[in-house]
Amino acid sequence: MKKWLALLLVVIMAFSLFACSGGNSNNSPSPNNSGTSGGSDTSSPASSGTGSPGSSETSSPPAGSNNDSSAGLDGTVDHFARDPYTISYVYGNSAPINIGFTQALEDFGKRMNFTVKSTGADFDPARVLEIIQADIDLGVDGFLINVMSETYPREHEMLREAGIPYINVMGPYFDAQGNNMAPAVAFNGYQAGSDITDWWLDNYPAYLGDADLSSIGFMVVTFTVALEFTERSDGALDRFRELHPELEDNIYYVDLTNFSMDIAYDSVAATVSGNAEIEKWVIFAVAEDFAVGANRAVESLNRVGSIIVLTTGNDVAFEEWGNNATPQLVALVPVWKTSMMGAAAEGIIALVDGRETEDTLWKELRRPNDVATLFYVETEVVTRDTYRDFIARIDAQFGIS
């Protein structure tokens, strides 16, 4: 019998949250949080992505290129031969990822002669459009937009009417047929999930000892209200099913009711406690907030050493690894600020300069039928032993020492 743990989705999010973006909780997870709910072992989770958790069909989004992190547009351009540009960065909330993105963008601005006007929208679609209109009226030169997908059609119209170039960050704007409609720098969540599965299947003995694979529970903690998180969990599960179709009953699918560390904490703790016969676990938390909750659950249950946690995102993990904390968090796919904002900065400045147009920008990477190019930054699994080398290599690609 398939052991799905499906936590019923509530309609509290009419829009899509963005990859690894921080949720609505900055509090430490509490085992007594009254906002959590259990799930049924027999119910099927809802899905906002392609495919479903119970399906063996490939649910990958249309594949773009998984590119080298450097966009390669800067070259020998003298950015200081012109007046400074003003670039508006509009983002969903003040989560650590967006703080890091803003800082990285400001650093690129010092090298590429632009200032940054950054504004958070508190996940309010109306506020997003207000910010965009206000910045259009101020006469900013370009936009980088990292917000909820329901605003995309209107923001696209507004910026086309204003004649101001923009690039979506993290979340592409797809039409009903799945075609990308505006330049975007994005994280390939499906590939990241697949990479995570490959990594743990190759490396789990180093962390879980001589446990037989058939005895290990594979828990995926996701949030299917948001497509980008669904893609990550789909990538991980599709790859696992492809390699080990006989281990379907080892999968435990936890679909959270909200983007919350607390709910992740309670859900992971309940799943582990409710399946006491499973001695070893691998937990893939598709967002770093969920990984924080999972880490705390592992600690509170005194299961460090018999459970390992994997995630996508790095704002908390790199700091904890640097402090030799959370030994159960063993690997992740970074959403690194230099990769994302370096490519985005190079792209938007090329558009504002007129060196590139929406049609020519990264055209060699464009998928058939797309109106504009979706540029995927590279995905790579790193550990506490390799993450510093990863940071140094990616930063060096963008000239950061």
Regions inferred by a protein language model and the residue ranges of each:
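An alpha-beta-alpha
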Residues: I87-Y91, L105, D195-H244, I251-Y253, ...
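Hinge/cleft segment of the Venus flytrap/periplasmic-binding protein
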Residues: P62-D83, S215, V221-F223, W336, ...
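Hinge/beta->alpha junction and helix N-cap segments in small-molecule ligand-binding domains
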Residues: V90-T102, S118-R127, M170, V185-D195, ...
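Periplasmic-binding protein-like
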Residues: S88-Y89, G139-V147, P165-V169, M219-V220, ...
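Hydrophobic alpha-helical
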Residues: F143-E161, A236, L256-W321
